UniProtKB/Swiss-Prot annotation:
Alphabetic keyword roster: ATP-binding, Cell cycle, Cell division, Cytoplasm, Cytoskeleton, Isomerase, Microtubule, Mitosis, Nucleotide-binding, Phosphoprotein, Ubl conjugation
Species this protein is from: Macaca fascicularis
Record's subcellular location: Cytoplasm; Midbody; Cytoplasm, Cytoskeleton, Microtubule organizing center, Centrosome; Cytoplasm, Cytoskeleton, Spindle pole
Activity regulation info: ATPase activity is stimulated by microtubules, which promote homooligomerization. ATP-dependent microtubule severing is stimulated by interaction with KATNB1.
Residue segments, region Disordered: 87-185
Name of this protein: Katanin p60 ATPase-containing subunit A1
Region span, Interaction with microtubules: 1-185
Enzyme class: isomerase
Protein purpose: Catalytic subunit of a complex which severs microtubules in an ATP-dependent manner. Microtubule severing may promote rapid reorganization of cellular microtubule arrays and the release of microtubules from the centrosome following nucleation. Microtubule release from the mitotic spindle poles may allow depolymerization of the microtubule end proximal to the spindle pole, leading to poleward microtubule flux and poleward motion of chromosome. Microtubule release within the cell body of neurons may be required for their transport into neuronal processes by microtubule-dependent motor proteins.
Assembly information from the UniProt record: Can homooligomerize into hexameric rings, which may be promoted by interaction with microtubules. Interacts with KATNB1, which may serve as a targeting subunit. Interacts with ASPM; the katanin complex formation KATNA1:KATNB1 is required for the association of ASPM Interacts with dynein and NDEL1. Associates with the E3 ligase complex containing DYRK2, EDD/UBR5, DDB1 and DCAF1 proteins (EDVP complex). Interacts with KLHL42 (via the kelch domains). Interacts with CUL3; the interaction is enhanced by KLHL42. Interacts with KATNB1 and KATNBL1.
Family: Belongs to the AAA ATPase family. Katanin p60 subunit A1 subfamily.
Positions with a binding annotation for ATP: G249, P250, P251, G252, T253, G254, K255, T256
Notes concerning its domains: The N-terminus is sufficient for interaction with microtubules, although high affinity binding to microtubules also requires an intact C-terminal domain and ATP, which promotes oligomerization.
Modifications after synthesis and translation: Phosphorylation by DYRK2 triggers ubiquitination and subsequent degradation.
């Protein structure tokens, strides 16, 4: 296969397309695309590959245009069904298609119309002879022809629509009911669209088993979100579901990961809200956004509103740094959260709306918000068992050497957060690659095979990674978190 052959085939395909021979043009276009695909495998230069891929896309667009023209020409072709269909050929079940008019039997009239009836009988008797003409009223014949044509066309159109509907009908469209759309009457369309973008429609794909340790936190979130939907009759009255849960802890301990697990496992509408979502430069619009958020959550209930870094939105009121606009937003948020408890208002736990919040600065949160977040749980640093489990989760896709002892590595990581442990694993997994490419030129690195790069991670790699990656949380920070949770915690 040569470039000259590809060039000649492209030239022939374009010439046939210009001459109107679209069938031959499509054959050449398809051959050119296949030849270019084979040629791309032999090209090693990245720049040339990009250029050839761009040319392939342009040729593919030309082929699609020719294909569209062929489809358009096919639609112009008349059906071979005769227009003058007999009356018994039409389906009797189609009520909207009028039946053809019944021929009226003409009887000879007395008196002066005798001559006309004789002419009619003569023409009727000689109708089968060649060269004789039959007198038929032009308007009635034309109407009969039009009625027959309309009936046939109506039947064909209905069959085409029915076939198209059956073709487009997928199993997902049959099984999944149509979701209700939020009525945005009274609100700006842009505000509604901005909040709808924060609804997580795609699965974050984080399971409870992907989170090491944190048994109490997972148990509480299941009790607050999952169990009320499984046992709605139980969670009523004083047993109503929790309206708010606050996750407190150092950075990197898995608070956001727990929220992703809630979005994956709990099958509720999940709103991922940040401070930028509820902030606007126009006066009064931020409060409208807060109110609209909770109204949409009630509409799509059961729902979970996750507010990460809630201290940036609802910090302590009455300070000198507070602005009037932020104070109004806090007031609206507090009012809406107090009215969020769907279970306490209509005794229907399946229509609940729960606020799930996370913060690294719980001492900066307003007292009224702290009261509304009824469950305040501490997300601590992982224990020795949790660190070992987290190592297994992070390294499950890697090939480890026989000398790797995860229990010993976990003991050396005391004081490390979950994010720190993940960074250690990532750095250790890159050590073998760094040793392999040391001293090589870019061309030699590009020519390395996959087998040479995928080497097992050794214990020495983890020891070197531990020397490079330090813990990010100090003992003084841990003491401050434990003091706050001892005073205000509600686990």
């Amino acid at each position: 296969m040569s470039l000259l052959m590809i060039s000649e085939n492209v030239k022939l395909a374009r010439e046939y397309a210009l001459l109107g021979n679209y069938d031959s043009a499509m054959v050449y276009y398809q051959g050119v695309l296949d030849q270019m695909n084979k040629y791309l495998y032999s090209v090693k230069d990245t720049y040339l590959q990009q250029k050839w891929q761009q040319v392939w896309q342009e040729i593919n667009v030309e082929a699609k245009h020719v294909k569209d023209i062929m489809k358009t020409l096919e639609s112009f072709k008349l059906d071979s069904t005769p227009l003058k269909a007999a009356q018994h050929d039409l389906p009797a079940s189609e009520g909207e298609v009028w039946s053809m008019p019944v021929p009226v039997e003409r009887r000879p009239s007395p008196g002066p119309r005798k001559r006309q009836s004789s002419q009619y009988s003569d023409s009727k008797s000689h109708g089968n002879r060649p060269g004789t003409t039959v007198r038929v009223h032009r308007s009635s014949a034309q109407n009969l022809h039009n009625d027959r044509g309309k009936a046939v066309r109506c039947r064909e159109k209905k069959e085409q629509n029915k076939g198209r509907e059956e073709k487009n009908k997928s199993p997902a469209a049959v099984t999944e009911p149509e979701t209700n759309k939020f009525d945005s009457t009274g609100y700006d369309k842009d505000l509604v669209e901005a909040l709808e973008r924060d609804i997580i429609s795609q699965n974050p794909n984080v399971r409870w088993d992907d989170i090491a340790d944190l048994v109490e936190a997972k148990k509480l979130l299941k009790e607050a979100v999952v169990l009320p939907m499984w046992m709605p009759e139980f969670f009523k009255g004083i047993r109503r579901p929790w309206k708010g849960v606050l996750m407190v802890g150092p950075p990197g301990t898995g608070k956001t990961l727990l929220a992703k697990a809630v979005a994956t496992e709990c099958k509720t509408t999940f709103f991922n809200v940040s401070s930028s979502t509820l902030t606007s430069k126009y006066r009064g619009e931020s409060e409208k956004l807060v109110r609209l958020l909770f109204e949409m959550a009630r509409f799509y209930s059961p729902a979970t509103i996750f507010i990460d870094e809630i201290d940036s939105i609802c910090s302590r009121r009455g300070t000198s740094e507070e602005h009037e606009a932020s104070r109004r937003v806090k007031a609206e948020l507090l009012v809406q959260m107090d009215g969020v408890g769907g279970a306490s208002e209509n005794d229907d736990p399946s229509k609940m709306v729960m606020v799930l919040a996370a913060t690294n600065f719980p001492w900066d949160i307003d007292e009224a918000l702290r009261r509304r977040l009824e469950k305040r749980i501490y997300i601590p640093l992982p224990s020795a068992k949790g660190r070992e489990e987290l190592l297994r989760i992070s390294l499950r896709e890697l090939e480890l050497a026989d000398d790797v002892d995860l229990a010993s590595i976990a003991e050396n990581m005391e004081g490390y957060s979950g994010a720190d442990i993940t960074n250690v694993c990532r750095d250790a997994s890159l050590m073998a690659m760094r040793r392999r490419i040391e001293g090589l030129t870019p061309e030699e690195i590009r020519n390395l095979s996959k087998e040479e790069m995928h080497m097992p991670t050794t214990m020495e790699d983890f020891e070197m990674a531990l020397k490079k990656v330090s813990k990010s949380v100090s003992a003084a920070d841990i003491e401050r978190y434990e003091k706050w949770i001892f005073e205000f915690g509600s686990c």
